[in-house]
Amino acid sequence: MTDHFDANVSRQIRLETEFWDNDPFERPGSDSLENILNKGVEASIFAEIIGQFAVQLAAAKNIVEVSGGQGWASCIVKRIYPAAHVTLTDAVPSAIAGHGIWERVFNCALDQAFAAPAQSISLPDGTVDLVFCYAAAHHFVDHEAALAEARRILKPGGWCLWLYEPTSSRLLHRAAEARVNRKRPDVHEHVLIPSVVLGQARAAGFNGTVRYWPSTLRRGRVESLYYLGLSFFPALCSILPCTAHFALQRER
């Protein structure tokens, strides 16, 4: 564990803190209907995704979510796997403060929740079976440090799952990032290059694979047609922009 972050990581944490402290729908104490309805749609996507990793999750006794925000995804995992010890982490304390909302919604109780960035998690070495994040790894900035920290806390053979991440081939990466940042100019978004992520994972001590997932869930009309086309021509997923999951297993 380290408390010395890359300057870009520190900047990212400041931006995220500003969001969680001030957003009218998600700041501490807001308990807004808009937030519950929005996350409810995300929850349906997440529930379908974790079904694809049921083997890894069912075998895990100690599960940690990184960059989990208010923890609704952790609560779903706890509800489906009640015997597992589920820990929620996020870099921003005011994000973690909202996890009680989702414990009520999903009728569960998380075992642990504390503020920690993905690059510095205050847990002992080799004590976790599975680390996951949902649509968050592309915000990590320093992916090497996040992977190194995941490896540190994982047991040999443990899993690190980066789920529902935007990806693109190196060839189209610049265009893909420009597109997503036109959609949300207020928050700079990154697009992951699978070959780069897998190379970083190998260097950190993982064996990894990427699973492309051209789902049409929660897409606009044009995006739905695009992802439907990718589902018919899966070979294009490794070239064109596509959502994907990274399944990384720590070497024994």
Which residues does each PLM region occupy?
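Conserved class I S-adenosyl-L-methionine
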Residues: 1-57, 59-69, 159-183
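Class I SAM-dependent methyltransferase SAM/SAH-binding core
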Residues: 69-120
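A conserved beta-strand element that flanks and buttresses the S-adenosyl-L-methionine
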Residues: 132
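Acceptor-substrate binding/catalytic loop of class I
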Residues: 180-195
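A short glycine-rich, Lys/Arg-flanked "PGG" loop and its adjoining helix->strand segment in the class I
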Residues: 144-156
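A C-terminal cap/extension of S-adenosyl-L-methionine-dependent methyltransferases
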Residues: 5, 28-31, 106, 175-180, ...
